[in-house]
């Protein structure tokens, strides 16, 4: 079969049959055209064109419409006869060109005008208007044959009389397409169903509930995942600045690595944490997830972890520790100096003055003033490094033999503070005022911004010698203004008493002797 189909003899037979069919069709068309020319009388005005003549226009329009319907019915019958008899065209553009060529030769040969009836029989269809309906088309009763050329489609469609009349201005109402549709199509609604948006939304909600909400967007859409990571980065920065934990968009097993601001941001996937076993841990974890302002604690804090102190309290404690250390250091130096240093003043009348192992009143006052000076300015006190003299204050008694009874010495020493308190009440008041001002200045004044000059021992000794010679200068030095710096006052008083202990003046001994005598009496 394949050889017979593809053989050259079969192709030749097909070509010969095609040529014969074309020649036979052209011969038939020429014979029909010649017979029509012989039967056609002289051209007269057609009845269809009587509309534009004088007379009653309404009757002429009705006649024209009836003639249009008659011509359509006649054409449909003739078309059916042509198809039944086998005179239907094969539907190729070449045959259409042959038909037009035959008509052109007939027109040129005879030189006569063809009537509309001949054009309808020779070319069955009028020139088409693609906007016309199928009801007015000539193909309603014709064949269902598929057209393959534009000329055939144009021939099969006729003009619509209603469209022509509405175009010419006839008709009082607006021309609507619904007027041609029967009323039975509008009595009942359409049974077609579109998209039910409520059902669609319900299915979407059901799918969201079945899937994991944390993994739904981040795993499906790359763009949403990128936006979530970016949002987490900004939330991480916000939580670092505001010191409040913030819930993230990304799943719990993924987090934004923002430990250091210079680190490159990256996403690390961690292993899932084990679920807490005890109800207390589960309740704590649930509360930490629900509340944004509570920091989740995976493990309890260690017992040795103490709460952080306030910065001001920490500074005060550090200052007090330093003061205690410096006090202990100064006390050790004073104890060593009591046994090492000798008395620089020679005794009167060749008698040696005994040294008492107990501190006297002057040494106690000097020690307290030195402690206050270390509290105010420990660095300046260490720089000056004043030497604490030993307690060598002599107590002149009428008996040339010094008593070595310790009980008597204790009684005498205990009586000295009382005597000193009675004789110098104003000095104690000024001392406590200075101490209170020193405490206030420790926390209110800026010690680093003010410069304090260290006082040398030689300068103090020179001032003391001048004050011995000039009592007015000593009185002015003792009555200093209240707005001077407290550290200078404390140090000057301590240096004065040190010099008094080294070089005791003559008029003070009778005063003490009289006080002691009055106390014994």
Swiss-Prot record:
Biased composition annotated in UniProt, kind: Basic residues: 505-514
Coiled-coil ranges from the UniProt annotation: none
Q: Could you give a GO molecular-function term held by this entry?
A: signaling receptor binding
Q: Where is the composition biased (Polar residues)?
A: 331-341
Q: List Phosphoserine occurrences by residue.
A: 311
One Gene Ontology cellular component term attached to this UniProt record is: TCR signalosome
Keyword terms of this UniProt record: Cytoplasm, Endoplasmic reticulum, Membrane, Phosphoprotein, Signalosome
Would the keyword Phosphoprotein turn up in this protein's UniProt record? yes
Kindly list the places in or outside the cell where this protein is found, as annotated in its UniProt entry: Cytoplasm; Endoplasmic reticulum membrane
Q: Name one GO biological process term.
A: positive regulation of T cell differentiation in thymus
Where is region (Disordered) located?
A: 331-351, 461-521
The PTM entry states: May be phosphorylated in response to store-operated Ca(+2) entry.
Q: Chief location of this protein?
A: cytoplasm
State its role: Required for the development and maturation of T-cells, its function being essential for the late stages of thymocyte development. Plays a role in T-cell antigen receptor (TCR)-mediated activation of the ERK and NFAT signaling pathways, possibly by serving as a scaffolding protein that promotes the assembly of the LAT signalosome in thymocytes. May play a role in the regulation of inositol 1,4,5-trisphosphate receptor-mediated Ca(2+) release and mitochondrial Ca(2+) uptake via the mitochondria-associated endoplasmic reticulum membrane (MAM) compartment.
* Protein name listed in UniProt: Protein TESPA1
């Amino acid at each position: 079969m394949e050889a017979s189909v593809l053989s050259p003899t079969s192709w030749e037979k097909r070509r010969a049959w095609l040529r014969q069919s074309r020649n036979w069709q052209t011969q038939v068309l020429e014979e029909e055209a010649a017979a029509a020319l012989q039967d056609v009388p002289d051209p007269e005005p057609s009845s269809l064109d009587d509309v534009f003549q004088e007379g009653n226009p309404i009757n002429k329009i009705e006649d024209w419409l009836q003639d249009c319907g008659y011509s359509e019915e006649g054409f449909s019958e003739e078309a059916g006869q042509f198809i039944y008899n086998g005179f239907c065209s094969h539907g190729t553009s070449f045959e259409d060109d042959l038909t037009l060529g035959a008509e052109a030769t007939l027109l040129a040969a005879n030189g006569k005008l063809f009537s509309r009836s001949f054009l309808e029989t020779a070319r069955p269809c009028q020139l088409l208007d693609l906007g016309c309906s199928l009801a007015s088309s000539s193909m309603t009763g014709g064949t269902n044959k598929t057209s393959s050329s534009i000329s055939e489609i144009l021939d099969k469609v006729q003009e619509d009389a209603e469209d022509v009349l509405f175009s010419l201005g006839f008709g009082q109402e607006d021309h609507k397409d619904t007027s041609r549709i029967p009323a039975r199509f509008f009595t009942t609604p359409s049974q077609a169903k579109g998209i039910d948006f409520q059902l669609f939304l319900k299915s979407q909600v059901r799918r969201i509930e079945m899937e994991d909400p944390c993994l739904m967007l981040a795993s499906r859409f790359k763009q949403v995942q990128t936006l979530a990571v970016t949002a987490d980065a900004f939330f991480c920065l916000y939580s670092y600045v505001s010191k409040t934990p913030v819930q993230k968009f990304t799943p719990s097993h993924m987090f934004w690595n923002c430990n250091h601001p210079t680190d490159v941001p990256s996403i690390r996937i961690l292993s899932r944490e084990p679920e807490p076993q005890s109800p207390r841990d589960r309740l704590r974890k649930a509360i930490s997830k629900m509340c944004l302002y509570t920091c989740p604690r995976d493990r309890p804090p260690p017992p040795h972890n103490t709460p952080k102190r306030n910065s001001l309290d920490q500074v005060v404690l550090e200052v007090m520790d330093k003061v205690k250390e410096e006090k202990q250091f100064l006390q050790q130096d004073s104890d060593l100096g009591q046994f090492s240093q000798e008395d620089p003043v020679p005794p009167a009348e060749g008698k040696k003055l005994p040294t008492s192992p107990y501190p006297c009143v002057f040494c106690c006052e000097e020690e307290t003033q030195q402690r206050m000076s270390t509290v105010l300015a420990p660095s300046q006190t260490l720089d000056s490094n004043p030497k604490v003299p030993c307690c060598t204050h002599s107590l002149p008694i009428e008996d040339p033999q010094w008593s070595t009874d310790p009980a008597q010495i204790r009684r005498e020493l205990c009586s000295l503070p009382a005597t000193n308190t009675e004789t110098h009440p104003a000095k104690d008041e000024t001392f406590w005022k200075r101490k209170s001002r020193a405490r206030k200045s420790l926390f209110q004044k800026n010690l680093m911004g003010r410069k304090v000059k260290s006082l040398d021992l030689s300068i103090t000794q020179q001032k003391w010698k001048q004050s011995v010679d000039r009592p007015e200068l000593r009185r002015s030095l003792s009555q200093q203004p209240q707005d001077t710096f407290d550290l200078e006052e404390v140090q000057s008083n301590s240096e004065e008493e040190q010099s008094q202990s080294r070089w005791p003046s003559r008029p003070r001994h009778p005063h003490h002797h009289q006080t002691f005598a009055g106390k014994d009496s």
